[in-house]
């Protein structure tokens, strides 16, 4: 499970790295080595447009803002194997996919591997270039009309050396698949 991640590149760097076409962001987010659930994050959606969302997908049936916010920390990750079935995630998976730019992510060792439990690891590319993590997003509206954009990271079974640390890992999206992923039609 990816419960924390880092984004050490700003909006301009993301714009360039992802060949973005438009910008929906009206303010810059600070660089952050410790992005936690419910923090505001950058997402790339639609025709490669930069937007912000709160990390943790708000379930569509939430009726008030307090319940919506409380539900977010339980929906930061969506399993790739069941995303199309789970009520919290299935609509967003069918209609609202995104990429989540990151520099790296943190994983805490479990008893699966050769490392002591709860030993943190920072996982990134050797060349420190951006990671593009597959995600989903949604737009939730309260009874009073407040709109909150939220997003979740898609995870899969860990492979290779990562499987010695934890059983899950984010789904990384190859550059050649970005447009196909962002257009679920």
Descriptions of predicted regions:
Residues 1-185:
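Short linear sequence motif anchored by a di-proline
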